[in-house]
Amino acid sequence: MQKKALVTGSSRGIGAATARALAGSGWRVTINYIQSREKAEALAAELGTEAVRADVSDSAQVQAMFDAAGPFDLLVCNAGIAWSGLLTDMTYSEWRRIVDVNLGGVFNCCRAAIPHMVHEKRGCILCMSSILGVYGGSCETAYSATKGGIIAFVKGLAKELGPSGIRVNAIAPGSIDTDMLSCFTAEDKQAMADASALGRIGRPEDIAAAAVYLASDAASFVTGQILGVDGNMVI
């Protein structure tokens, strides 16, 4: 039987690349989106699967998504939002929103996915953190906090679920060429490339390849780990 995966926030960018790569590795991948319906449905048609709209910060919507398309053998928590600026310019509602999506979304999706995985005594959870979750970033304090929280979440959950045969890992991307970089100038992007030992910005496919590895049997003894895919970025 074909194994099933859910990739949240997979209508574009890293999520879409990950969905394509997993599908190419034999997974049946459910596409999740909140705003980009046309892109999500086009990707679902390309992969011969379904696209399900759900706001990951809303536990009821997440559960409805799992009821409609699940259960899943692999959960990739990719959905997330960013906020740039001085912390003193950030409102509490903006703080709550980024925490609710980036951390709350991981909690909601994991809580919905775990019962089936525990019952089957197998499963895999991957969460997208960030290099900023490791080192922090100026004018990215809230984003860094949520991505750092994901790292602690993954390490704790891996210990909790290990006895049930479930692996939990995270990927910490560096600067990746997605829509999140659209607000940066060419000079800014060059500086990001220069900060990498490899002299370039990463591609979504770089992250997707890491996800395919961590989801595969080749990583059967890998859990509780944070895989940096950043070109040895210097912060």
Where are these regions (language model features)?
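Residue(s) in the substrate-gating loop at a strand-loop-helix junction
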Residues: 130
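Conserved glycine-rich Rossmann-like NAD(P)H-binding loop of the short-chain dehydrogenase/reductase
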Residues: 25-41
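Substrate-binding pocket helix/loop in short-chain dehydrogenase/reductase
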Residues: 86-87, 94-99, 181, 192
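Active-site helix of classical SDR
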Residues: 110, 146, 154
